[in-house]
Amino acid sequence: MHRRPFLSRLCLGAVAATAGCLSRRDDRDHSATSRTRSTGTDASPPRSTDRTRVAAGDTARRTVGTGSLDAGGLRRPARIAFTNPTSEPHDGTLTISRRDERVLDEPVTLAADASLVASLTDLDAYTARVSGPTLRGEQTATLRPGGFTCNATSTAITVQDDATLSSTRVSTRMACPGVVTDDVAAGDTTTETVGAAGAGGDYAFRLRNATAASWTTRLRVDTDSTPRFDGVYTLAPDSTAVVRLRDRRAYTASMRVLGTEATATARVTPADFDCPSAATRVSIDAAGSLSVARDPSASCTTSSV
């Protein structure tokens, strides 16, 4: 038996020579574990009697989620693939879970050089697992929210010639202006800036975790319908993420707490930049809900919905 190249089938193209997205934890946004067992007559059967059969050289594609990543922001969907680049067919089940919810559970027979590819269209934490009666073991791969960037990213769980499994993450490496992923330690504050200094404005959106638990959040800033900033923050207790705006114009900030799906939106106008120390403060409470308030030190008003 021999292995055939598969990564080109993922359509990721050549790796760009530019720097990657601004991220302080890229290496931790993907991980993989494996466990090997011998095959035999006592192998567990697939959980479903409907088995997808993918012909040699073909790819079966699935879409998982509501498509929210295509609706706005600077991040794009990521893919998880179960691939068989060997010359022999293999049976396996690809299971993908979003937090505690199973979102895909598909038994499949992959002929030689065949694959099953799932596109994840909602930003969240995912775990993928492959196992099967013709495979020597199982493989698990995880994708954290920060693994969704402006790049084309794919995690492939691949059958080897000896029927074991391996996991590889492949991504283009284009620069991603405005895309930030950060873990903020307890009591700390991290600050990012949108626009150039001296551009005539200074306004801040402040997102604070006022609880004793850690929360993962997404903070987007748009001008009109154009995305300008897309941050994913894991906020430890009593930590804050700040986005400072330097361009004097209208902005909309959209915030979401992953896990509770709580959302909030705040808007500012060019006139709001006249306020001294102008800021909109957003707080996460113990239930994972969001509250929006104008900085009490400023006299202007900010609309929120």
Label the predicted regions:
Residues 1-305:
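Terminal disorder- and signal-encoded targeting elements
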